[in-house]
Amino acid sequence: MTSTLPFVSVIIPVYNEAENIQKCLNAVTSQTYPKSKYEVLVVDNGSQDGTKEIARQFSTAYDNLEILIEDEQQGSYAARNTGIEQSSGAILAFLDGDCSPHQQWLERGVSTISGTGVDLVGGNVEFTYPNGGTAAERYDSFTNMQMKESISKRNVAKTVNLFVRQDVVEDVGPFPNHLISGGDVHWTKRATDAGYSLTFAHDVIGCHPARPFGELLKKQFRVGKGQIQVWMLDRISLRRVFALALWILVGFLPKPPHYLSQDLRRTGQTVTKAMFVRILVVAWCCRLAENAGRLSYILRSEEQ
């Protein structure tokens, strides 16, 4: 049976992930999928916190794990592209360095993509609460990386936990190297627009730590900058400029409470009234940070 299994390349871009990479690689190297049938490509993007050294310990212990370097361009998409260039698998499994997959992650991901004939599989992201479930962690857990929602409503996915056939990557092309954020959504949209099929697999699970408040604000600022980058990829028209201006104006307003209530119900979470108020404040701060990212990129572009 092993001889008929497809070879898989697990691609993990990392940048200053010393806090999480050991847990991630422990999980990736302990899969039920035969070790002779997969390789792990850790692509370091200029880490300065010991991430590379931790990964090297694993490459010494495991023949199927290799460290690659992408130091010409900063960005996770550039790192993923480097991994793609060096990969040998018929299936590519993208994973973030702070995401720790369940032991049957590879086996179930390959089974889904091979058994159903689909081209892309987005896995489930389960959140953990390193700080006990603060308002910021709660908000992150029901708003970010909602793979089922992204796939069912928008037909796009994130690379935090994504399986793709290698021939799809060959046809669609590489990730946009220059994007700060949103490159995975942009890329998967290109793939599905080209006719490739994408499905969600609830049992292909990766565990991700929910972000604390400061990290969440940094992420949303980066997301805002990436949104403008993606917006600028399409032809600019007066109608689109007007829509962008309205988008930015609305971005200064608090998120309506009923939307947050819907998100909580969708993910099966219940919180106290006091926690809900704190989540509302976090949501507004994140919205402002995202808007600041948009304006920052627009103003920077005007200066160049």
From Swiss-Prot:
Q: Which Gene3D superfamilies match?
A: Spore Coat Polysaccharide Biosynthesis Protein SpsA, Chain A (3.90.550.10)
- Name where it's found: Cell membrane
Top enzyme class of this protein? Answer: transferase
Question: EC number(s)?
Answer: 2.4.1.-
Cited Pfam families: Glycos_transf_2
Q: Which GO terms fall under biological process for this protein?
A: S-layer organization
| One cellular-component annotation, GO | plasma membrane
Instruction: Please state the pathway this protein functions in, per its UniProt record.
Output: Cell surface structure biogenesis; S-layer biogenesis
Summary of the knockout phenotype: Mutants contain only mono-, di- and trisaccharide-modified phosphodolichols. Deletion does not alter cell growth or stability of the S-layer. Mutants exhibit defective or limited motility.
* Major localization class: membrane
For this UniProt record, the keywords arranged alphabetically read as follows: Cell membrane, Glycosyltransferase, Membrane, Transferase
What are the recorded GO MF terms, alphabetically? glycosyltransferase activity
Q: What does this protein do?
A: Involved in the assembly of a N-linked pentasaccharide that decorates the S-layer glycoprotein and flagellins. Catalyzes the addition to the dolichol phosphate carrier of the hexuronic acid found at position 4 of the pentasaccharide.
Q: Which family is this sequence assigned to?
A: Belongs to the glycosyltransferase 2 family.
- Protein name per Swiss-Prot or TrEMBL: Glycosyltransferase AglE
Species this chain originates from: Haloferax volcanii (strain ATCC 29605 / DSM 3757 / JCM 8879 / NBRC 14742 / NCIMB 2012 / VKM B-1768 / DS2)
Taxonomic lineage per UniProt?
Answer: Archaea, Methanobacteriati, Methanobacteriota, Stenosarchaea group, Halobacteria
